[in-house]
C-alpha cells in the first residue's frame, strides 16, 4: 500500500482537494490556500468543520516539500491506475513494449501484470497481434489496444518498427 494514499479515499480527499488547489499549483498557491483553509476551519470559527486542522496540516506539509510532493503524486497515479481511471486523456493508460516482459517461443510474446487487478501476466499479446492489429500513431510509431484477461482494464501499448538496417 502506498504510504500516502488509501484507495478508498482517492477521489474524495486527496491533499489537493483538502487545500482546494489543483495538481499544477505552485508553492505560493499552496501557502495561500493553507492559510485560507486554516482560518476557515479553525475550531473557534467553525466547530462543525468536516476538514480537520490535522488533515490541512498534513496536506500542506506534503505538498510544500518537493520530494514529498513527488512521492505523493507518484502514489496517487499508481492508486488511480489500480482503479482503472483515465489518466491520459483518451481513456486508456499508455505503456511501451519496454514495460512488458518478453518471452521468445515459436513467436515472440509480451506479458505484463495488470496494473489494476495485479493478476500476474494477464496482459499479453504476440508479435502477430502487433502486425495484424497495430495502427499508426502519427509519430512514426504504432499503437495496439489490449485487455487484461482477468479484469476489464484496456491499455494502449506504443511500439516502433525496427529497421534491420539500423541494427547493422
UniProtKB/Swiss-Prot annotation:
Residues 91-160 form the DPH-type MB domain. It is found in: Cytoplasm; Nucleus. It comes from Debaryomyces hansenii (strain ATCC 36239 / CBS 767 / BCRC 21394 / JCM 1990 / NBRC 0083 / IGC 2968). Required for the first step of diphthamide biosynthesis, the transfer of 3-amino-3-carboxypropyl from S-adenosyl-L-methionine to a histidine residue. Diphthamide is a post-translational modification of histidine which occurs in elongation factor 2. PROSITE patterns: DNAJ_2 (PS50076), DPH_MB (PS51074). One of its GO terms (biological process) is protein histidyl modification to diphthamide. Pathway: Protein modification; peptidyl-diphthamide biosynthesis. Keywords: Cytoplasm, Iron, Metal-binding, Nucleus, Zinc. The keyword tRNA-binding does not apply. SUPFAM superfamilies: Chaperone J-domain, CSL zinc finger. Zn(2+) binds at residues 114, 117, 148, 151. This is Diphthamide biosynthesis protein 4. InterPro entries: DnaJ_C/III_chloroplastic, DnaJ_domain, DPH_MB_dom, DPH_MB_sf, J_dom_sf. CDD domains: DnaJ. It comes from the Eukaryota. GO terms for cellular component: cytoplasm; nucleus. The keyword Iron applies. Belongs to the DPH4 family. The DPH-type metal-binding (MB) domain can bind either zinc or iron ions. It holds the Pfam family DnaJ. GO terms for molecular function: metal ion binding. Residues 14-76 form the J domain. SMART domains: DnaJ (SM00271).
Amino acid at each position: 500500500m502506498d504510504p500516502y494514499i488509501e484507495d478508498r479515499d482517492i477521489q474524495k480527499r486527496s491533499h489537493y482537494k483538502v487545500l482546494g488547489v489543483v495538481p499544477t499549483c505552485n508553492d505560493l498557491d499552496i501557502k495561500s490556500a493553507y492559510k485560507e483553509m486554516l482560518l476557515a476551519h479553525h475550531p473557534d470559527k467553525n466547530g462543525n468543520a468536516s476538514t480537520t486542522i490535522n488533515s490541512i496540516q498534513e496536506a500542506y506539509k506534503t505538498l510544500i516539500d518537493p520530494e514529498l510532493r513527488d512521492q505523493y503524486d507518484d502514489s496517487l497515479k499508481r492508486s488511480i491506475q489500480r482503479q482503472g481511471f483515465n489518466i491520459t486523456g483518451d481513456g486508456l493508460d499508455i505503456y511501451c513494449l519496454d514495460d512488458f516482459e518478453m518471452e521468445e517461443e515459436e513467436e515472440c510474446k509480451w506479458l505484463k501484470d495488470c496494473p489494476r487487478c495485479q493478476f500476474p501476466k494477464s496482459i499479453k499479446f504476440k508479435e502477430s497481434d502487433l502486425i495484424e492489429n497495430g495502427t499508426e500513431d502519427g509519430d512514426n510509431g504504432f499503437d495496439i489496444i489490449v485487455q487484461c484477461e482477468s479484469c476489464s482494464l484496456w491499455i494502449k501499448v506504443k511500439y516502433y518498427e525496427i529497421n534491420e538496417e539500423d541494427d547493422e
